[in-house]
Amino acid sequence: MQDQLDHELERIDKLPKLGLLWVEYSAYALGVNIAPRKRSSKYCRLTRILVLIVNLSIIYSLVAFIMENYMISFETYVEAVLLTFQLSVGVVKMFHFQNKVESCSQLVFSTETGEVLKSLGLFQLDLPRKKELLSSVSLILLNNWMIIDRQVMFFFKIVCMPVLYYCVRPYFQYIFDCYIKDKDTCEMTLTYPAIVPYLQLGNYEFPSYVIRFFLLQSGPLWCFFAVFGFNSLFVVLTRYESGLIKVLRFLVQNSTSDILVPKDQRVKYLQCCVRLFARISSHHNQIENLFKYIILVQCSVSSILICMLLYKISTVLEVGWVWMGMIMVYFVTIALEITLYNVSAQKVESQSELLFHDWYNCSWYNESREFKFMIKMMLLFSRRTFVLSVGGFTSLSHKFLVQVFRLSANFFLLLRNMNNK
């Protein structure tokens, strides 16, 4: 007979998960198939080659612009530097997750199907109120998926703002120059400052201006897929892990309940809880191994980008307020990007800290010798909370987030002082 919990997990697996779906599509657009059970990986290699060629072409064009204007002023090419960093990090992320695509797809599969909770044996025990227990566990999981969808789609909307700005800016600029300013000559400008190399063959250019224009237009889209796709994947995995810990906390809290768990079943019930703890610990280690080094890269680059944006904001305040809206959206996107890592990791850590107290507060002192022994062992194991590290150097937390922003502010002050001199 199939476990009731397994049956419920299959039902939840079939429910639409908008946030995770967009994450999968974003990764797939870069040639990284993190959900092979849903779609084929046949053309992923070709997609990655195409994405790499296009991204390197755009990066080369941006670097060419930076070198051309290097001696003028930093304000002239700061936007090109920002985009170069974003595209470069996107390429690094693409290769990183492709190298770990098996681990990544396994985590996504485990998260979506509830593999960690399957075959626990909990609902094969002789419990009087299995329905109540099952509905409570199911409610925790469903609410957790709702939170995941809300967070991911909120980040989706934020990341879309600078992408839309870059995509529509040349068209609005063209309308303004030709019809509002009433210039004698007007032409379509490039999406952002860049020098795309081309060959002049008589009256023809290769690649043509149209191709160069749309090449640069694709840049913000590649940034979107890398920023949204892989950062939101971290949110999905860690949020789901915190949901698993919530389920375990609920089970531990009721391990000595006379209503839900009879006294003769408590040792077996607690064994199921211990089994779940071991699985969550293994799941956590997989997330840690997948993200710890790429988070270090992301935090370092985000710190530099925030510093440059602060500098750009200071120059805009002096020159005018025309670009302030766009720069603030860009700033919010990058700040939110690094904040999501820390807030999601902090949530997991907070839940694991609460789990330690739940093991201790479950009235274990009135139970059997075997029950007491298992509780003591779990108190020993759960003293070490589930933390996610930054390259193995420090842990993601609210404290680390403050340090990143403080470091960015210090770099900004240093940059401004150097420029003034």
Curated annotation (Swiss-Prot):
> Where is the protein found, in the record's own terms?
Cell membrane
**Membrane-side (Cytoplasmic) residue stretches:** 1-48, 93-151, 239-289, 337-384
Which GO terms fall under molecular function for this chain's record? ionotropic olfactory receptor activity; odorant binding; olfactory receptor activity
Chain segments annotated as transmembrane: 49-69, 72-92, 152-172, 218-238, 290-310, 316-336, 385-405
InterPro entries attached to this UniProt entry? 7tm6_olfct_rcpt (IPR004117)
Entry keywords, A to Z: Cell membrane, Membrane, Olfaction, Receptor, Sensory transduction, Transducer, Transmembrane, Transmembrane helix
Function per UniProt: Odorant receptor which mediates acceptance or avoidance behavior, depending on its substrates. The odorant receptor repertoire encodes a large collection of odor stimuli that vary widely in identity, intensity, and duration. May form a complex with Orco to form odorant-sensing units, providing sensitive and prolonged odorant signaling and calcium permeability. Involved in the behavioral responses to ethyl acetate, pentyl acetate, methyl caproate, anisole, heptanal, 2-heptanone, r-carvone, nonanoic acid, and pyrazines.
What is the protein's quaternary organization? Interacts with Orco. Complexes exist early in the endomembrane system in olfactory sensory neurons (OSNs), coupling these complexes to the conserved ciliary trafficking pathway.
This protein's name: Odorant receptor 67b
Q: Which gene encodes it?
A: Or67b
